[in-house]
Structure formats: C-alpha cells, structure tokens
Amino acid sequence: VTPSPATDPGDPASYAARVARHVPGLRDLHVMAGILLAEHVPDQGRVLILGAGGGLELQAFSRAHPGWHFDGVDPSPTMIAQARRLLGSDTANITFHQGYIDDAPEGPFDGAACLLTLHFLRHDERLRTLRAVHRRLSPGAPFIAAHHSFPAGGDGEPDLWLRRNAAWLVAGGMDEAQALAGIETMKERLPVLSPAEDERLLIEAGFHDVQLFYAALTFKGWVARA
C-alpha cells in the first residue's frame, strides 16, 4: 500500500490521495480507529504507531486527540520524512523512531495501532511482532490492526477477492491493466493470511477480546485488548 523505501512518495497531498485510492474508506478507517483507541486511552495517553511512515494515521489521531503523545516507528527514512512533511509543525507530541518493533520504546503504552503494515510480514515474524507490541502495552490497552486479509486457500477464492479489489480500483479511475498488474504483485509479494489466521495470531500473541470492526474487500481491521 505504501511506497517502497527506495521510492519518493511525492508531495503529501498526492501521497495521501494515492493511498486513499487503494484503501476503501481510508479516512473512515482512521476515524474509527481513533474512536476505538479513545475508549481506553486517557486524554494524556501515550500511543504506539507501528508503520508510521507517511503520517496519515498520525495526522488523523493527533488532530482528534491533541493530548495524546505518539511514538511512531517505521523502517524507512524516506517515509518518516514524508510524515514530517505531511504533519508540518504539528509534531510537538510525536516522536519518530527509525526501525522495527524492536526499536520502539518499551512503554508501557496506553494504546497502539498498526495500519496497512502487517500484511508485509510472514506468519512467524508477524506473530513475533504482535507479541512485541503486546509486551509494550499496559494491561487492557487497546490495539488496532488493519491490513490485507482474505481467504488464502486453493479453491480460487483468493483470486476472486483480488479481482474484486481490482474492480474497485478500476471503478475509482485506475487503468484496468495497472490494477491487474497490482494484483499479480500482491500475489507474489504479500504473505497474506486469512481473517481466521490473523485472529488466531492476535490471540496467540496474548491479546483478548478480538473484534472485527472494518471489512472492505481484501482489507480487514480488528480491535483487541492487551
């Protein structure tokens, strides 16, 4: 969903528009995620954002909850720079950390979110990452995860969902050949898990009260408690 570290994402407005074209209801996803975090994060709470490059969720969360402090983690210096450009002067309550979950502060955090990121990780690394997030959260703290998650069996259903995703992109104005090429790239590069597998990983990592709150073609989103 996000550009690779070697790719210049462009100016903040065009980057935001490009991501929104690929993720159905992106703005509403950010709003819903903020609402779910706010059910348990206090007014002056500390929130961990994993995969914070680009800054879109940081912008949405910090505007809605100016009292929160955010630690944003991302491996790409290019995408962290993009987040800084997007946020402008609104970074007083945001600390960036270049790296992965092991480079994040130990916490404890009052909440955490990882949007459009976990689908890049294979099963074992995804589980390890989720456990590391869980370890950094206060007991009962909310965690939001949203990413590509759809049936991955051999009965043709994965291709059906990918075709539906491509059809949505074409309906939004993307060239059909480009949309279909994107599907092939996803099939080759993304170690996508099924929703049931994603939920099992959250539970295995120590989370409880796992609830689906967002479903948009190939994308799913959950809220869980540490």
Say what each PLM segment does.
Residues L48-I49, G54-D103:
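Class I SAM-dependent methyltransferase SAM/SAH-binding core
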Residues L127-P139:
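A short glycine-rich, Lys/Arg-flanked "PGG" loop and its adjoining helix->strand segment in the class I
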Residues H148-E204:
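C-terminal alpha-helical "lid/dimerization" subdomain adjacent to the S-adenosyl-L-methionine
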Residues S4, P9-R27:
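Class I SAM-dependent methyltransferase Rossmann-like catalytic core
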Residues G140-H148:
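Conserved beta-strand signature within the Rossmann-like core of class I S-adenosyl-L-methionine
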Residues H208-A226:
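Core SAM-dependent methyltransferase catalytic element
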Residues A104-A112:
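A short acidic, Gly/Pro-enriched loop at the edge of an enzyme's catalytic core
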Residues G25-D43:
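Conserved alpha-helix/loop element of class I SAM-dependent methyltransferases that forms part
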